[in-house]
Amino acid sequence: MYHRLILLALVGTTMANVIPFSMSNIPEEYKEFIPEEVRNFYKDLTVEDKEILRELASKHATFANEDAALEALKDKSDKLYKNAVELRNFVKAKIDSLKPDAKIFVDEIIAKARSLRSDDGHKLDTEKIKQAARDIIAKYQALSEETKEELKVTFPAIAKIIGNEKLKRNASTFLQKN
């Protein structure tokens, strides 16, 4: 269970940086687990900013890469672009600080999270998310203890999640096969 929570936290943090969402959709008791930098980014969004993010998210399949998406964002809102780049740089610096094994693992999580986005803007497939989480858990369990510890230190929000009994129960229920 401990491993599942760590991985769900990593996936959640990654998804927060890959898929625009509204902080208002997250129950209050879980908001504390979202990194402060991510919370601040979403807290400062205007209605117009949210609409721009929704529009660009619906077109994500048309962007060759993250830089192309950021350029499209810059064309829509310079302020939003600067905030997004700041958040991206924060996450990138955390990832770049990791040793090779941990970095490869996080890069795989990001790639997996990006692959879950639907090209047509429809709702995410819950079964695909569950399978992706199971795959990531298996990879995580194969990591050395040193690498696991490095991930916990680099992503401190994970430490909060590990001790939360309600989240442990929810994660276990969510990942159960039908």
From Swiss-Prot:
Residues 67-89, 130-153 form a coiled coil. InterPro entries: Gp-FAR-1. Keywords: Coiled coil, Lipid-binding, Retinol-binding, Secreted, Signal, Vitamin A. Residues 1-16 form the signal peptide. The keyword Coiled coil applies. Its main location: secreted. GO terms for cellular component: extracellular region. One of its GO terms (molecular function) is retinol binding. It comes from the Eukaryota. Disulfide bonds: none annotated. Not glycosylated. Belongs to the fatty-acid and retinol-binding protein (FARBP) family. Binds retinol. Also binds the fluorescent fatty acid 11-((5-dimethylaminonaphthalene-1-sulfonyl)amino)undecanoic acid (DAUDA). The long chain fatty acid oleic acid can act competitively to displace bound DAUDA and retinol. This is Fatty-acid and retinol-binding protein 1. The lineage of its organism: Eukaryota, Metazoa, Ecdysozoa, Nematoda, Chromadorea.
